[in-house]
Swiss-Prot record:
One of its GO terms (biological process) is carbohydrate metabolic process. The active site is at H307, H346, D402. Pathway: Carbohydrate metabolism; tricarboxylic acid cycle; isocitrate from oxaloacetate: step 1/2. This is Citrate synthase, peroxisomal. Peroxisomal protein involved in the cellular biosynthesis of citrate, and required primarily for cell growth and modulation of multicellular development. Belongs to the citrate synthase family. It comes from Dictyostelium discoideum (Social amoeba).
Length: 492
C-alpha cells in the first residue's frame, strides 16, 4: 500500500547521518561543505556558528546555541503568522508562487482539472498515487456508501434556528459526528488505533462521504425544505446537486454542465499546502484527537473571512462597482487607499494563480448553460484594466482563485453564506491527506509554538480592599449596536 511505502521511505531517510544534518557544527567544515552551511555571528560575544542547510532550511533549534550564559535558553525565531517558518516536511502539494505553479503529488493542477474527477484526485492526495480502474471503483464505492446520516444526526440539524448560518451548522454537525463513532476516538479506544490503516480509512470514507450530505441538509434547512437523502449510484458532485435541488420530480437529474463545473472547482480547492485551515488540522491532530474533531476545527478556521470568505468579498466588490464605466474611478480609489481590490494578490503567489485561469474558463461554460451573469463583464474588464496598470503589476497583484469562483456559485443559485461550505467539502480531502501524512511522519510532535513574553514581570497579590481601580480593556466601550445585540441575547 502507498501508506506503507511512504513509511519505509521516511524511515530510510532518517539515517544517523541525516538526523545530524541540521545540527550545529562543532568541528571545522571543508570548503565544499561550507557551500551547504550558513555562518551566524553573535555580535554580543563575537562567537560564530556554522549551521547546516538542508532543503533550503535551517533547524530552528540551532539558535538555542546562541547563548550569553550557559543555560540561558538561547535565541528563538520570531515569526508572526508563520511567514517564513516550515513546520513539516510534506509530499502532498507543491507550489511555486513566483512561477504560478501548483501540483498535487507532482501532477500539474491544469492536467488534473482537465482530465480527472474529484474522487480520483481525492485518492491521489490521500494515497499518494493515481488509482487504476479497480482501485478507483472500490474507493468511490466505499465513499458513496457512507453518504447517509444517522437519524439522530439529522434530528440534531433540525434543531438549529431557521436562519442558522450553513457553515455553523456544518461545523457543529461534523463535531457531533465523532460521537457516533467512539471506536474512532483515541481518547476512548486507545491512542494507537490509527496505526491500523483499516480504521484510518474508515474515517476517511465517512467524512468525505457525509460532508456533501451535511452541506445539502444545511442548505435545505436554510430555505425551509425537507432534507433529501443521497442517491449513491450518482457521481459525487451529481449526488450533491441532487440533494440540494430535488423537489418532487420522480426522475430529477442535475445539469451535467454544473456537475462538471463543480467537479473542477472541487479539484482546484482540494488542497493548497499549509494554509490556515490545514495548519489548524495538523495542529489539532498533533494532540492525538480524532479526525472529526480536527476537521471541525479546521472548518472553523476556514469560516474566517480572511480565509474562506474571500470570494464573497469579491462578489460584494463587483456589486459595488456595478458597471464597467465605474471601473476607472474604482481603480483610482484603490490606488489612493480609499477602496480595497479584492480577489487580487496572494500570500504565496506572486504571479497569476493557476487556479484562477482555469476557473475563468469554467465561469464562461457555466454562463453559456445558465445565461450570462451580468457581473462577469465587470470582472473581466476589471481584470484587464488592473493587469495593464503598472501600479498593480509592479506589486505583483494578479487574480487569485477567489476572483471568479464566487461568480460561478452565484450563477448556480448559491447565496454567499454557502460559499465557505462549498469550500469545506473539497478542502476536507486535503485536510485528511495531511492528517494521514502527520500520522505516518516519524518526526511528528505535538505542536507547541513559543511566545515572546512582554507582560508584567513580578507582582505581589494585593487584597481587594487595597487596590486602586484597575485599567480595563475595551469591555466598557462597546458600540451601541453591539450593546443592543448583547441586550437582546441576554433578555431571552
Amino acid at each position: 500500500m502507498a501508506h506503507i511505502d511512504r513509511i519505509n521511505i521516511l524511515a530510510n531517510h532518517l539515517s544517523k547521518e541525516e538526523e545530524e544534518e541540521n545540527e550545529l557544527l562543532t568541528s571545522p567544515v571543508s570548503a565544499d561543505k561550507k557551500k551547504e552551511t550558513v555562518t551566524v555571528t553573535d555580535n554580543r560575544n563575537g562567537k560564530s556558528y556554522d549551521f547546516k542547510i538542508k532543503n533550503d532550511t535551517i533547524n530552528a533549534l540551532n539558535f538555542k546555541e546562541l547563548q550569553l550564559a550557559k543555560g540561558d535558553g538561547g535565541l528563538m525565531i520570531y515569526d508572526p503568522g508563520f511567514q517564513n517558518t516550515a513546520v513539516v516536511t510534506s509530499y502532498i502539494t507543491y507550489i511555486d508562487g513566483d512561477k504560478g505553479i501548483l501540483r498535487y503529488r507532482g501532477y500539474p493542477i491544469e492536467e488534473l482539472a482537465e482530465r480527472s474527477n474529484f474522487l480520483e484526485v481525492a485518492y491521489l492526495l490521500i494515497n499518494g498515487n493515481l488509482p487504476n480502474k479497480s482501485q478507483l471503483d472500490g474507493w468511490s464505492n466505499k465513499i458513496m456508501t457512507h453518504t447517509f446520516l444517522h437519524e439522530n444526526l439529522v434530528g440534531l440539524m433540525k434543531t438549529f434556528r431557521y436562519d442558522a448560518h450553513p457553515m455553523g451548522m456544518l461545523i457543529s454537525t461534523v463535531a457531533a459526528l465523532g460521537t457516533f463513532y467512539p471506536e474512532a476516538n483515541p481518547a476512548l479506544a486507545g491512542g494507537d488505533i490509527f496505526k491500523s490503516e483499516n480504521v484510518r480509512n474508515k474515517q476517511i470514507y465517512r467524512i468525505v462521504g457525509k460532508l456533501p450530505t451535511i452541506a445539502a441538509c444545511a442548505w435545505r434547512h436554510r430555505i425551509g425544505r425537507p432534507y433529501n437523502t443521497p442517491v449513491n449510484h450518482l457521481g459525487y458532485t451529481e449526488n450533491f446537486l441532487y440533494m440540494l435541488d430535488k423537489l418532487s420530480e420522480p426522475d430529477y437529474k442535475p445539469n451535467p454542465v454544473l456537475c462538471r463545473a463543480l467537479e473542477i472547482l472541487f479539484i482546484l480547492h482540494a488542497d493548497h499546502e499549509l494554509n490556515c485551515s490545514t495548519a489548524a488540522m495538523r495542529h489539532i491532530s498533533s494532540s492525538g484527537t480524532d479526525p472529526y474533531t480536527s476537521v471541525a476545527g479546521a472548518a472553523g478556521a476556514l469560516y474566517g473571512p480572511s480565509h474562506g470568505g474571500a470570494n464573497e468579498a469579491v462578489l460584494d466588490m463587483l456589486i459595488h462597482i456595478g458597471s464597467k464605466e465605474n471601473i476607472p474611478q474604482f481603480i483610482s480609489d484603490v490606488k489612493s487607499k480609499k477602496k480595497k481590490l479584492m480577489g487580487f494578490g496572494h500570500r504565496i503567489y506572486k504571479n497569476y494563480d493557476p487556479r484562477a485561469k482555469i476557473i475563468r474558463r469554467v465561469a464562461y461554460e457555466v454562463f453559456e448553460s445558465l445565461g450570462k451573469e451580468p457581473l462577469i463583464e465587470v470582472a473581466t474588464e476589471l481584470e484587464k484594466q488592473a493587469l495593464e496598470d503598472e501600479y498593480f503589476v509592479s506589486r505583483k497583484l494578479y487574480p487569485n482563485v477567489d476572483f471568479y469562483s464566487g461568480l460561478i456559485y452565484k450563477a448556480m443559485g448559491f447565496p454567499t453564506d454557502m460559499f465557505p461550505v462549498l469550500f469545506t467539502i473539497p478542502r476536507a480531502v486535503g485536510w485528511l491527506a495531511h492528517w494521514v501524512e502527520h500520522l505516518e511522519d516519524p518526526e511528528t510532535k505535538i505542536y507547541r509554538p513559543r511566545q515572546v513574553y512582554k507582560g508584567e514581570w513580578f507582582r505581589n497579590y494585593v487584597p481587594i480592599d487595597g487596590r486602586p481601580p484597575a485599567k480595563v480593556r475595551s469591555q466598557d466601550s462597546y458600540s451601541s449596536a453591539t450593546t443592543k445585540r448583547y441586550s437582546k441575547v441576554t433578555s431571552h
